[in-house]
Amino acid sequence: MVAPVLHQASSEQARFFDYRSAANPQQSGLINAVPYRSFSPDFFDQSGCDVLPLDLSEMLGCSGPATGPSLCANFVRLDRGEQRTSAVATSQLFFITNGEGETQACGQTFPWSKGDILVLPAGGDAIHTSSVKAGLYWVHDAPLLRYLGVEPAQARFEPSFYSHHDSRRH
């Protein structure tokens, strides 16, 4: 029988938290409160296709764009055209605020209209098109991955589409 080798452990760099602190990083002082800022919906009244990051990174003291320490929210405007979106993120969520169109991503085409939600896994661009004015609210976790210094290696789930028509049935 071989005797185990004992190593002297050091806790100089360790931090200990009870559940209340771990569950509330703001209260424990690990992160600051996300500052309040209103973003005007006038962006959607303008012409052309564009993306507006709802960027608070300067106020948060982190690299941006970032709306919070771990997420970036964006407005996406489509004006009878096409807009490509891309993020180094584990997932992306698109909520359709108005209009109708379609998104090509992950080798599939997703027709959408107001009230629908599309969730995409890591791994590529999304191309949104609309023959009318349309608006999307886009959220992804690129700020968290940037902070951690990592990139997603593979998609961990299949794309998911939630029609607003289905929500009326439940």
Region roles according to the model:
Residues M1-G68, G149-H170:
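A short, N-terminal "cap"/entry segment at the start of jelly-roll beta-barrel domains
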Residues L52-C62, L71-V88:
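Conserved short histidine dyad/triad with adjacent acidic residue
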Residues P69-C72, V132:
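Residues at beta-strand starts and edge strands
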Residues D79, Q83-D116:
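A short beta-strand-loop-beta hairpin characteristic of the jelly-roll/cupin
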Residues Q92, G135-W138:
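Short hydrophobic beta-strand segments that form the core of ligand-binding sensory/regulatory domains
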Residues P111-V132, V139-A142:
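Conserved metal-binding segment of the jelly-roll/cupin
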Residues V119, D125, D141-F161:
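Charged mid-protein connector segments
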